[in-house]
Swiss-Prot record:
HAMAP family per the UniProt record, alphabetical: ProA
Organism of origin: Ruthia magnifica subsp. Calyptogena magnifica
Swiss-Prot/TrEMBL catalytic activity: L-glutamate 5-semialdehyde + phosphate + NADP(+) = L-glutamyl 5-phosphate + NADPH + H(+)
UniProt keywords, alphabetically: Amino-acid biosynthesis, Cytoplasm, NADP, Oxidoreductase, Proline biosynthesis
Lineage: Bacteria, Pseudomonadati, Pseudomonadota, Gammaproteobacteria, Candidatus Pseudothioglobaceae
Subcellular location: Cytoplasm
Protein role: Catalyzes the NADPH-dependent reduction of L-glutamate 5-phosphate into L-glutamate 5-semialdehyde and phosphate. The product spontaneously undergoes cyclization to form 1-pyrroline-5-carboxylate.
CDD domains hit by this protein: ALDH_F18-19_ProA-GPR
Keyword flag Cytoplasm: yes
Protein family: Belongs to the gamma-glutamyl phosphate reductase family.
Top enzyme category: oxidoreductase
InterPro entries found in the cross-reference section: Ald_DH/histidinol_DH (IPR016161), Ald_DH_C (IPR016163), Ald_DH_N (IPR016162), Aldehyde_DH_dom (IPR015590), G-glutamylP_reductase_CS (IPR020593), Glu-5-SA_DH (IPR012134), GPR_dom (IPR000965)
Entry protein name: Gamma-glutamyl phosphate reductase
Length: 419
């Protein structure tokens, strides 16, 4: 226990010292670091895949679910995506040092705000090894030092990627402790990290609801959290048939194990006969298990009766709940009761109802005629994201560069004194 505590103290002290220099680093230096990291990843593909394969074999031997193994897997396409997200972050404007709202006051002074890093961030995540790069890159570009703690199931993949990060930082001449990895499977390290308020300014957990709630309940530092993604797609009575089928099918089946996948499909009763039978057939052909309300059950004997628990479940699997509603008000009421505040989408050609939907639905992302799968920092032009916050404070929705910053007041005078 003492050795783990000492480890976190050492990492915390290193991170805090590194943050002092990183917040003053130039945009060129930070971008060069990311360029170097991308180059290191490209040059070390073989060792990264070897490490990832070791994690996949261990995961299969331990009986990890298919969706978890999918999150864990790295292939050429996904590694190319990691490099592309680095390039996108490089091309994003550097928010640090930006001065806004600079105004003269009656006293003659000018008062404005300057964007600054949060300081030291602790990122705790499960399964997805690409988070090692996404988190490090966003923290470095936004001037924050970071302590990373990945899931034990991805320990070899995370270390292989972290080695690329460390080498990229070193090549750019920045403090190597700008990014550090807790390379132990001991859970005490997580407990100590979230309590390290003397060193860590904020904790960002990425993982299942159980992990996020446990960290939120025990942390002594602010937590930017993403609890879960019970996302809804609502097909309105005036929905275009082709759009509705395409959007609803993609929102569920593009990838099952992601937080922006639709888990519940709501369909207006007036749209059922022309849209739902074909959509149900497509889902069943794809192998999606369907659970429906009483009215939905009448459409196919292959649909299972939905329970109250289903409406509150983030499946992260090839399972979809379907409910037929008699009005948009009923759909919104369902979302308010069962949603997690992540992402909801309406499919409709009616402008007034679409506007009403995005106004009344209280979620981090609300869409019109688009798949919930677009709820992603990369798709929003933020570069990679550290997570999708379902909180309303300090940041909401995909957490990109600006979400990892704060503002301080600056005052400009010319010998002004207060009377």
């Amino acid at each position: 226990m003492d050795s783990i505590k000492n480890l976190i103290v050492t990492l915390g002290e290193n991170a805090k010292n590194a943050a002092k220099t990183l917040r003053c680093a130039t945009t060129v230096a930070k971008n060069n670091t990311l360029i170097n990291i991308a180059s290191q990843i490209d040059q070390n593909r073989a060792s990264i895949f070897k490490a990832n394969n070791q994690d996949l074999v261990n995961g299969k031997n331990k009986g990890l679910e298919t969706t978890l193994l999918d999150r864990l897997m790295l292939d050429e396409e996904r590694l190319n995506g990691v490099i592309e997200s680095l390039n996108q972050i490089i091309n994003l404007p550097d928010p640090i040092g930006e001065i806004t709202d600079l105004k003269y006051q009656p006293s003659g002074i000018q008062v404005g705000k300057m964007r600054v890093p949060l300081g030291v961030l602790g990122i705790i995540y499960e399964s997805r090894p690409n988070v090692t790069i996404d988190a490090a890159a966003l923290c470095l570009k936004s001037g924050n030092s970071v302590i990373l703690r990945g899931g034990s199931e991805a320990i070899h993949s995370n270390y292989a990627l972290y080695t690329c990060v460390r080498q990229g930082i070193k090549q750019a001449g920045l403090n190597e402790n700008c990014a550090q990895l807790i390379n132990t499977q001991n859970h005490e390290a997580v407990i100590e990290l979230v309590k390290a308020s003397d060193y860590v300014d904020a904790i960002i957990p990425r993982g299942g609801k159980g992990l996020v709630e446990a960290i939120s309940n025990s942390a002594k530092t602010p937590v930017i959290k993403h609890l879960n993604g019970i996302c809804h797609t609502y097909i309105d009575k005036d929905a275009d048939k082709k759009k509705a089928i395409s959007i609803a099918f993609n929102a569920k089946t593009r990838r099952y194990g992601v937080c922006n996948a639709t888990e519940t499909l709501l369909v207006h009763a007036c749209a059922v006969s022309r849209i739902l039978p074909k959509l149900i057939a497509q889902y069943l052909t794809k192998g999606v298990e369907l659970r429906g309300c009483k009215e939905t059950l009448k459409l196919s004997n292959k649909i299972i009766a939905a329970t109250e628990k289903d409406w509150n479940t983030e499946y992260l699997d090839a399972i979809l709940s379907i409910r037929i509603v008699n009005s948009m008000s009923e759909a919104i009421k369902h979302i308010d009761k069962h949603g997690s505040g992540h992402t909801e989408s309406i499919v409709s050609e009616n402008y007034t109802r679409s506007r009403r939907f995005i106004t009344e639905v209280d979620s981090a992302s609300v869409m019109i005629n688009a798949s919930t799968g677009f709820a992603d920092g990369f798709e929003y032009g933020l570069g990679a994201e550290i997570g999708i916050s379902t909180d309303k404070f300090h940041v909401r929705g995909p957490v990109g560069l600006e979400g990892l910053t704060s503002q301080k007041f600056i005052v400009l005078g010319d010998g002004h004194i207060r009377q």
